[in-house]
Amino acid sequence: QSFRWKENADGSFDGIAFGKKVRVRLDGERLYIENSNKADFESIWKDYFDLELDYGKIREEISEIHPVLKEAAKYAPGIRILRQEPYEALCTFIISQNNNIKRIKGIVQRLCENFGEEISPGDFAFPTPQKMAELSADDLAPLRAGFRNRYLIDAAQKVYSGEVDLESCRTLDYEQARKELMKITGVGVKVADCTLLFGLHRIEAFPVDVWMKRA
């Protein structure tokens, strides 16, 4: 789940990740990545889209667990778990708390426009923890993110100082990795699990949304 992709009229998608903007389109079973090169494909996009993992095998395995999972696997066979930049995943899921997708995307866009590096005219990378650690919650007022501003600043300061070590969460015991992320003000179990799954590819993480609980 990423908030920096926009669908175009022709069905292609424009997105920014790891400081690069690309256009992605699907033609049959072929995936085309435009505005890129072979080096970036090998070092960024192959990993980002998790292209080397056999999702067909995973669908087969989960289909045997429960009929509901079998139907879910059939419903959206093309879904892949994106390997996003960990700090960006952390911040965007902090922003996602008690929020809707349209508003989340707007806040993330304003965050990048105000504090991210311009990588091409009108396009901005996600701001670094170093940049955000220099700011105050009041500096984030243009984002219109409300109470989340102080959570974002706390996250930036703790990541930049090393108090929270995102990279260590790749190899820590799952529960310990969760606890590491929950040192950040405003990060509970769900945001920690989303960060672990989408930012650190800890596939044992299973974020449970409020709508799943209500169902």
What are these regions (language model features)?
Residues 1-215:
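HhH-family (HhH-GPD) DNA N-glycosylase catalytic core used in base-excision repair
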